């Protein structure tokens, strides 16, 4: 089945390319590999965060057709706030309501009745309530497959207990059970669900024991993310954190690091600094900036920043899935200090390929040890690079997904 050329429809709440944050990087990595061997059509929602023409052109590099549908609900602003308020009175989650766009269903109706597909792949379960049962006369129904990315309702539950302001926690408490209902409904409707980690797969199977599942790990372009002779050398004092800074796990992780961990590092290494890289940081993160703490905003190329870093820090306390930031830094040959949750799903040996620490003092001690011993940091980085090349390339991840497509199609034969 893997050798069969498939016709695949990707439906997503965001474009895959150009990839600027983790969810896009997963989509881009898998789709660009699959596009080498299969016929891809993409239907994507585009909100005010993206340039529709730029995104469509970038995705046409590996798709036969890309159809963009404007989403009236922006990432920020009045429309988003009004929708959030409406969701409080709804039986459905905000995440589902945000992608319930009539124009999207109209496009899906047309594409699915005009063209034959073997697989309909939903990127995120939020679209699972839409109608994907149409198909041309005389053809078989395409199989519905969902890329989970993360168990979103579990993240929302975590946030309702420990994250953010009191108002945000109250909103999460009101929303997460509705999100659980909507998300599990999508998984149960699907012919197959693939997830980023074994831990997430277990969580799903606990809730939906009959689901057909597979693990398709996050990965990296190990040829793009690799040490280069032209990169600046690591300066021995710079720490780096990167990610989309508008997301709850990243906001919490950065805040926790700067407030609770950073003082233990800066006192031991007064010349050290932390560089926080990523788009859309909220005012609360800007307020943390200082002489030794800088926010760069979004950068087009992470590699020079990673190359110059002595250590990548991943102080995450919330979230699911697996962290693309870790895999990309491993591919760059960097020493990484992470919490257990941050490294969840990464098949790396603690102490050899990565350092794991869960409380502020031990996290700071791990970082301080690497800053004091550059040779050990370099050794861990080399070992991390080997793991990334052997286990976390997008080509390998795409082959795993192709095998899962085959399993789903064979079950329907």
Question: For each of these PLM feature ranges, what is it?
Answer:
Residues 354-361, 369-374:
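Conserved acidic donor-binding segment of nucleotide-sugar-dependent glycosyltransferases
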Residues 325-328, 335-339:
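Short hydrophobic beta-strand element within catalytic cores of glycosyltransferases
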Residues 376-391, 400:
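A short, well-ordered alpha-helix in the C-terminal region of glycosyltransferases
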Residues 191, 293, 307-321, 332-335:
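Acidic donor-binding loop of glycosyltransferase active sites
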Residues 77-132, 167-189:
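Conserved nucleotide-sugar donor-binding subdomain of glycosyltransferases
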Residues 1-69, 113:
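N-terminal subdomain of nucleotide-sugar transferases
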Residues 143, 153, 172-227, 234:
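Donor nucleotide-sugar binding/catalytic pocket of nucleotide-sugar-dependent glycosyltransferases
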Residues 215-308:
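Conserved catalytic-core segment of nucleotide-activated headgroup transferases in glycan assembly
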């Amino acid at each position: 089945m893997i050798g069969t050329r498939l016709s695949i429809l990707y439906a997503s709440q965001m474009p895959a390319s150009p990839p600027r944050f983790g969810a896009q990087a997963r989509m881009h990595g898998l789709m660009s590999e699959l596009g080498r061997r299969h016929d891809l059509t993409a239907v994507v929602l585009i909100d005010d965060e993206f340039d529709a023409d730029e995104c469509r052109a970038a995705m046409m590099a590996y798709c036969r057709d890309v159809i963009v549908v404007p989403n009236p609900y922006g990432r920020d602003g009045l429309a988003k706030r009004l929708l959030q308020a409406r969701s409080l009175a709804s039986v459905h989650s905000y995440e589902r309501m945000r992608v319930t766009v009539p124009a999207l269903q109209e496009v899906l109706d047309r594409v699915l009745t005009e063209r034959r597909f073997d697989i309909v792949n939903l990127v995120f379960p939020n679209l699972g309530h839409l109608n994907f049962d149409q198909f041309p006369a005389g053809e078989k129904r395409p199989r519905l497959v969902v890329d989970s990315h993360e168990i979103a309702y579990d993240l929302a539950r975590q946030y309702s207990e420990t994250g953010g302001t009191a108002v945000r926690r109250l909103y999460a408490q009101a929303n997460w059970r509705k999100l659980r209902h909507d998300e599990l409904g999508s998984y149960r409707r699907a012919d197959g669900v693939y997830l980023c980690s074994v831990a997430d797969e277990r969580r799903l199977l606990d809730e939906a024991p009959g689901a057909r599942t597979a693990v398709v790990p996050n990965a990296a372009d190990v040829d793009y993310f690799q040490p280069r002779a032209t990169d600046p050398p690591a300066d021995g004092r710079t720490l780096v954190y990167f990610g989309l800074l508008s997301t709850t796990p990243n906001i919490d992780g950065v805040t926790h690091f700067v407030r609770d961990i950073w003082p233990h590092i800066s006192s031991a290494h007064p010349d050290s600094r932390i560089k926080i890289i990523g788009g859309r940081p909220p005012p609360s993160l800007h307020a943390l900036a200082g002489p030794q703490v800088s926010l760069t905003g979004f950068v087009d190329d992470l590699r020079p920043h990673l190359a110059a870093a002595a250590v990548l820090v991943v102080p995450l306390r919330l979230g699911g899935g697996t962290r693309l930031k870790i895999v990309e830094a491993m591919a760059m040959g960097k020493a990484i200090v992470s919490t257990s949750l941050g490294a969840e799903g990464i098949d790396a040996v603690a102490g050899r390929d990565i350092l794991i620490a869960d409380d502020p003092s031990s996290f700071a001690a791990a970082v301080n040890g690497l800053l004091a011993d550059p040779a050990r940091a370099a050794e861990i980085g080399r070992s991390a690079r080997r793991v990334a090349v052997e286990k976390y390339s997008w080509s390998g991840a795409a082959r795993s997904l192709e095998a899962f497509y085959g399993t789903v199609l064979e079950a329907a034969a």
